[in-house]
Amino acid sequence: MIKLKPVIYISISFIFIFFTNFIYAAEFSWKFNNGLPETRNESKELDRFADDVKNATNGGLNIKIYHGGSLGLKNNDVLRWLPTGAAEMGLVWANYLGRDAPALNAVYIQGSVGSSDEHIKAIPVLKDIYSAELKKWGIVPSGFMGLPILYASIFCKGEPVNSIEKLRTKKLRVWSKDMVDTFKRLGVSAQIIGQTEMYVALKTGVVDCAVYPALYAHTVSLHEVTNSASYLYPIAGLPYVLGASEKKWEKLPESYKNAVKSAAEELFQRSTDYTDDEANEIEARRKLESQGVDWLVDFSASDQRAFLDAAAETWKEAANDAGGDALNNRARILKAIGR
């Protein structure tokens, strides 16, 4: 039997390790599409999530977060590009899915809940619904990221607005179809404009006002293009889904899948700590005032009720139109929040 010299063993071993590591690195370097601005706290949390996965896999799975839609992949197209693996992972938010998945879009609309307590009760049901629905699209819900308790305010330039009557004379920016429908019921003209285009739309007069939470107004420099704001309703803060392309996910070793799920669960726990949310909202409003935004008295109780009533009609209609599981999903959420 011919014996290989030790140097040959070493050379062969080195070549094997080099080759397998090359394949390994190429297969598990993933892109994550995040449509939110890099300055948002959620974006910072996603960076931390990616670091946690990298550390847990000893660098074997490297997830690079691309913020602000820098990959050129649009939020409302996520059900089209994510299953193909154009990016292996992406942030999925049901509010953007109205065109391709009306049943998902109808799960939980703006105005679905009337308080933060109701919203917190709805979250476990929402997670179950999204997990089941996204799997039908070839998307693995590897985890979730919660939103803080947010408060939707109407930011306007020019004439101060803190009543629905005045809002009827303005052009309003919103972010989802259900909001267009709800405001239409109130006689308000609203149009969908992405947050990356919102600043220019306000500056150039495409719209006069925008629905946005005070907590995040600084991330899109709203104080530069508006001069007043007033609170209208509690935001139905749908949890974001950390979606993964199923065909890419299946190529991961189980240990890596578990690392992603574990890091995602830690992210969800951090993002659903609501202890300081009310204080943060107050501080955000004060900061905006210091930057020149006049914080007005809230919309009246009757206006707030009118918005929630209009939203309830929109939600019911959207569920009926969507068909399938939409009505059952709505019933599950109503039961969870005690209605």
Predicted ranges, named:
Residues 18-25:
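Sec/Tat signal peptide C-region and signal peptidase I cleavage site
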Residues 120-133:
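Signature of the catalytic double-stranded beta-helix
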Residues 25-118, 134-137, 141-339:
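N-terminal secretory/targeting leader peptides
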Residues 1-12:
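Bacterial N-terminal signal peptides that target proteins for export
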